[in-house]
């Protein structure tokens, strides 16, 4: 039995199948941890979502910003982007079952000293605190008034965590941290403008995971979201978004032994396949 964490798939279905073949994934005895952004922008969003749902007993998936975006577009709260590849899901006969399954995925998963989250954790948060905060968002997403959450989910504010935050400001802050965070100030104020490489981070900002005395430094955090960051491997940190969508690689980390497995973007996947180039 082995557990594999897999980086952002984003509808790159054939690349996923190639990676599963490489690691010899056996759904009877193995487990997958998916870092979120399962769907969108790659050509196989419907196939990828159906595959994940059909293997739900063998995987844990946390929500990413593209997964939440799909839910908001499906409910009509935001317009689809030109780069979205979600229409096949919306037109599918099993659309409602697929979207409900997606809506009930967690924001964060913690097990045996390891944490799975899509983008990151605010440096002020301990892993235990973050798990409880993520559950607040999960209750909103799974409750009868989930429409209200999706309708007011978008926005960049507030950027600074305060324990007294309430209502949608609190839920939006938690959601943005867990699904959109890359860099912040040393005191933990989030910046959503920067999406580039480590060497290009502007003065006064730093990766969330490099903030001194980060509250979650006592656990191993596994995340994705930041494709320009590339593969990062530290004793207590693994970044697994290696840009498969952009013609890079799809990456898996076997938690037992911390071994990395990678496959190149399949020719049928990624933005080149969509653009016909």
Curated annotation (Swiss-Prot):
Keyword set, alphabetical order: Hydrolase
CDD domains recorded: MPP_ApaH
Pfam name, any one: Metallophos
InterPro entries noted in UniProt: ApaH, Calcineurin-like_PHP_ApaH, Metallo-depent_PP-like
Enzyme Commission identifier(s): 3.6.1.41
Annotated GO MF terms: bis(5'-nucleosyl)-tetraphosphatase (symmetrical) activity
Xref: SUPFAM superfamilies: Metallo-dependent phosphatases
Principal EC category: hydrolase
Reactions that this protein is recorded to catalyse: P(1),P(4)-bis(5'-adenosyl) tetraphosphate + H2O = 2 ADP + 2 H(+)
Top-level taxon of origin: Bacteria
Role, per record: Hydrolyzes diadenosine 5',5'''-P1,P4-tetraphosphate to yield ADP.
HAMAP family with a match to the protein in the record: ApaH (MF_00199)
Family per record: Belongs to the Ap4A hydrolase family.
Protein name: Bis(5'-nucleosyl)-tetraphosphatase, symmetrical
Organism placement in taxonomy: Bacteria, Pseudomonadati, Pseudomonadota, Betaproteobacteria, Nitrosomonadales
């Amino acid at each position: 039995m082995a557990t594999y964490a897999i980086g952002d798939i984003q509808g790159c279905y054939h690349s996923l199948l190639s990676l599963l073949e490489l690691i010899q994934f056996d759904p009877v005895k193995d487990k997958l941890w998916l870092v979120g952004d399962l769907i969108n922008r790659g050509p196989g969003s419907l196939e990828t979502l159906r595959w994940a749902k059909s293997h739900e007993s063998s995987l844990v998936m946390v929500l990413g910003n593209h997964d939440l975006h799909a839910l908001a577009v499906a409910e009509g709260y935001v317009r689809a982007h030109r780069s979205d590849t979600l229409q096949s899901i919306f037109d599918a006969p099993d659309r409602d079952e697929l979207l409900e399954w997606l809506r009930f995925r967690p924001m964060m998963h913690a097990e045996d000293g390891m944490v799975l989250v899509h983008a990151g954790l605010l440096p002020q948060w301990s892993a235990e605190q973050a798990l409880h905060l993520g559950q607040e968002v999960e209750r909103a997403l799974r409750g009868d008034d989930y429409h209200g959450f999706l309708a007011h989910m978008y926005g960049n504010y507030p950027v600074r965590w305060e324990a007294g935050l309430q209502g949608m400001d609190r839920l939006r802050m938690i959601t943005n941290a867990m699904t959109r965070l890359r860099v912040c100030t040393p005191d933990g104020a989030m910046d959503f403008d920067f999406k580039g490489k480590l060497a290009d981070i502007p003065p006064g900002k730093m990766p969330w995971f490099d903030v001194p005395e980060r509250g979650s430094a006592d656990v191993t955090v596994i995340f994705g979201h930041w494709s320009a960051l590339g593969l990062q491997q530290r004793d207590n940190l693994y970044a697994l978004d290696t840009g498969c969508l952009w013609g890079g690689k799809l990456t898996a980390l076997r938690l037992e032994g911390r071994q990395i497995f990678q496959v190149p973007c399949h020719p049928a996947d990624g933005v080149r396949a969509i653009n016909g180039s």
